[in-house]
Regions:
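Bacterial N-terminal signal peptides that target proteins for export
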Residues: 1-8
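Alpha-helical transmembrane segments
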Residues: 11-15
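Insoluble glucan recognition modules
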Residues: 22-82, 98-171
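C-terminal motif of bacterial Sec signal peptides marking the signal peptidase cleavage site
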Residues: 16-20
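Beta-propeller fold detector
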Residues: 92-97
């Protein structure tokens, strides 16, 4: 009886590793190739712009890009515009989400761009800033790899400060 238990334990010790190492036919996650997203192509309306306080509500810059087409089942593509000064990490700057309009554009007025230079990037009046921008296309489907457009460069000069002198000085 003592030897019988040894034979049973030996058979189990041999059978369990053999059974656990058998071929496992569980399916893997689908390959990312089945859903491919093309990178958008970004363009900017002006490469050099001097902002003007008299045109504060007019469009100063317009970013437009091509649609990032998806070769897959129904997945909607969302876009984010990233903007930062030259020499800094592009994705740590300003992020503006695309609103879902029919045309793939984001615009800045003279006032918006001037406020961005002064408040966000710490610029001074009359100072020229060189910027870089890109568009990041992504979907809600984790199997589709996100794509980023090539960077575009442009420069903007903030409003020159207006010096208002009083008509007369009072003492």
């Amino acid at each position: 009886m003592k030897h019988l238990w040894k034979y049973i334990a030996g058979a189990l010790a041999f059978a369990l590793p053999v059974a656990s190492c058998s071929d496992d036919n569980t399916s893997d996650f689908p390959d990312k190739e089945w859903g491919e997203l093309t990178a958008p192509v970004l363009t900017v309306s002006e490469e050099e712009i001097t902002l003007d306080a008299n045109k504060a509500d007019r469009e100063a810059l317009k970013f437009s890009w091509t649609a990032a087409s998806v070769v897959t089942r129904s997945s909607s593509v969302e876009y984010d515009l990233y903007l930062n000064i030259e020499g800094e990490d592009l994705f740590k700057g300003i992020k503006r989400e695309w609103g879902g309009e029919a045309d793939l554009t984001i615009s800045f007025t003279h006032e918006e761009l001037n406020d961005l230079i002064i408040t966000t990037f710490g610029g001074k009046s009359g100072e020229r800033f060189a910027f870089r921008a890109c568009v990041y296309a992504h979907t809600d489907n984790y199997l589709i790899e996100d794509k980023t457009s090539e960077e575009v460069a442009f420069a903007a000069t903030a409003y020159a400060a207006e010096v208002v002198k009083p008509a007369s000085l009072w003492m």
